């Protein structure tokens, strides 16, 4: 499959094209020892180059990776981490919003509620999923599932990946801001373990609406910000061309957000990013989720809620 190489990955692309050409020769039955050694050397060179390039990424390059069209989405993680997923639909008020995917699943046999934003792959699915931008009915569906999880004492695991809540007229008329605010309020006091993970873009209130939890994690090349770099650049410099500068200034990367103590953990991605190896990324994330869940289940309800309250109240505190 084509990896849709980003600009900074072009040197890697050249090597990988050479590797693929040699492997095609191999598949044609013309492989000899000399050719096999050449492929091995090129792979080693490619890995070294990837390590060098990805160790020096700037905030804008990380933003590009967070939006990579082949990056694994919520459904990809559900298929690899959980079993027996049973999707629920509708907010019982207005409609079903395909931008929010949610339902009951099992994590190594334990029932959990899984909720996440879902972007689309092809044009038709992108339109169906509204490019991962939920409407009020999506957030109300998420709230319905979270309250159901609390009622049945199931842990909640959310996957955040959105450029932001949908800003259309219809969404505003149906109470977009109220839906987000209500989710924040309810999530702050849920009486079950809640683990949130930013898997791609964490866009403003649209991300926060399913992002209040006991543990908040970010994948290594995900982002979290109040506005997109392009949006910030358009406001401050009147030009979206300044997006790289805005990305650096806002500190959108997982590393920077962790330095500010706004999240709990970083989850390492495979060399070259999550889009290069879905299975390896899912394994890394599953380890993190199970560890977080075990830690939270070891606490009493009072201890868990107290820790959550203290964590939330520490945001924005300056000594």
From Swiss-Prot:
Oligomer status and interactors: Acetyl-CoA carboxylase is a heterohexamer composed of biotin carboxyl carrier protein (AccB), biotin carboxylase (AccC) and two subunits each of ACCase subunit alpha (AccA) and ACCase subunit beta (AccD).
Enzymatic class: transferase
Span of the signal peptide: none
Protein location: Cytoplasm
BP terms from Gene Ontology: fatty acid biosynthetic process; malonyl-CoA biosynthetic process
GO MF annotation list: acetyl-CoA carboxylase activity; ATP binding; carboxyl- or carbamoyltransferase activity
Reaction(s) the record says it catalyses: N(6)-carboxybiotinyl-L-lysyl-[protein] + acetyl-CoA = N(6)-biotinyl-L-lysyl-[protein] + malonyl-CoA
Entry's family note: Belongs to the AccA family.
Residue ranges constituting the CoA carboxyltransferase C-terminal domain according to the UniProt record: 34-295
InterPro entries: Acetyl_CoA_COase_a_su (IPR001095), ClpP/crotonase-like_dom_sf (IPR029045), COA_CT_C (IPR011763)
PROSITE patterns: COA_CT_CTER
Protein name per its UniProtKB record: Acetyl-coenzyme A carboxylase carboxyl transferase subunit alpha
Gene Ontology CC: one annotated term: acetyl-CoA carboxylase complex
SUPFAM superfamilies associated with the record: ClpP/crotonase
Pathway: Lipid metabolism; malonyl-CoA biosynthesis; malonyl-CoA from acetyl-CoA: step 1/1
Alphabetized UniProt keyword annotations: ATP-binding, Cytoplasm, Fatty acid biosynthesis, Fatty acid metabolism, Lipid biosynthesis, Lipid metabolism, Nucleotide-binding, Transferase
């Amino acid at each position: 499959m084509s990896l849709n190489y980003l600009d900074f990955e072009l040197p890697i692309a050249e090597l990988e094209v050479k590797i693929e050409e040699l492997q095609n020769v191999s598949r044609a039955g013309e492989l000899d020892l000399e050719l096999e050694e050449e492929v091995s050397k090129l792979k080693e060179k490619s890995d070294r180059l990837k390590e060098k390039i990805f160790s020096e990424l700037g905030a804008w390059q990380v933003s590009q990776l967070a939006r990579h069209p082949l990056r694994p989405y919520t459904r990809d993680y559900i298929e690899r981490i959980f079993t027996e997923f049973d999707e629920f639909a509708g907010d019982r008020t207005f409609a079903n919003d395909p931008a929010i995917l949610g339902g009951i699943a099992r994590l190594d046999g334990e029932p959990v509620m899984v909720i996440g934003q879902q972007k689309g792959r092809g044009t038709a699915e992108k339109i169906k999923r509204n490019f991962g931008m939920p409407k009020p009915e999506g957030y109300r569906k998420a709230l319905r599932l979270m309250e159901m999880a609390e009622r049945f004492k199931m842990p909640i695991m959310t996957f955040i990946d959105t450029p932001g809540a949908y800003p259309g007229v219809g969404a505003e008329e149906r109470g977009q801001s109220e839906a987000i605010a209500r989710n924040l309020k309810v999530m702050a006091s849920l009486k079950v373990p809640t683990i949130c993970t930013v898997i791609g873009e964490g866009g403003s209130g649209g991300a926060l609406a399913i992002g209040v939890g006991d543990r908040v994690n970010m994948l290594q090349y995900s982002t979290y910000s109040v506005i997109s770099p392009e949006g910030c650049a358009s406001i401050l410099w009147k030009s979206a061309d300044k997006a790289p500068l805005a990305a650096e200034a806002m500190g959108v990367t997982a590393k920077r957000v962790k330095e500010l103590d706004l999240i709990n953990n970083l989850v390492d991605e495979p060399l070259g990013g999550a889009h290069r190896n879905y299975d390896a990324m899912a394994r890394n994330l599953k380890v993190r989720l199970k560890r977080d869940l075990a830690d939270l289940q070891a606490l009493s309800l009072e201890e868990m809620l107290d820790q959550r309250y203290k964590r939330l109240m520490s945001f924005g505190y300056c000594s």
